């Protein structure tokens, strides 16, 4: 009788255990790509629109835009652009910089530049191979570049991702032309400014690149980023050969969540 009762209890216990609901599987670990995208201060589809002034004259428009998540040679790439159009009769600027950069390393993988500043006019297409520190320009044989290269457009987005401490000068050997390095970024001060888009607390930086153009060493450029986690570029002033070319934020369209399915997660080649 005791053995029969023990068997009955054991069977009942086994049945209870068998009927217990299964524990759900743990959520998958986020990928390196998802983690990198989550830490970016800008989002998919962000569009910043600017009024361009040459001195005191309103003479054009500019945009800084995140066009989406793409793929370059199997590697994920943020596609972004910086476009400036404006000027006066004796000096006009019509610049377009497109960049595809890996959000995990902030390395440029591809860049297209159409630069028209005064009498300077050039179109260049670049393919970057960060793992080999090489680049190809306009389909020509490869030449050396730097580790984790950055072009002009990706450098603007890179500046939004780093700490900016007033009084410090940061140096980076990441401009894609090795002989033009280091790029110096001088954090000058904090400032409260008013632009068409509103009033902002900002951090003012001065980038210096050993090249011609808006950020060239021969001129003087300052950038006002918002003093918050987004580091939105709200104002840019650049002294050029024929005067000052200034950008003032007039409209901001916030971005949306990234869709990691839009790009491969292969390493950059």
Which role fits each region the language model picked out?
Residues 1-130, 163-269:
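Acidic, serine/threonine-rich low-complexity disordered tracts
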Residues 120-162:
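Hydrophobic, well-structured mid-protein blocks that either form specific transmembrane helices
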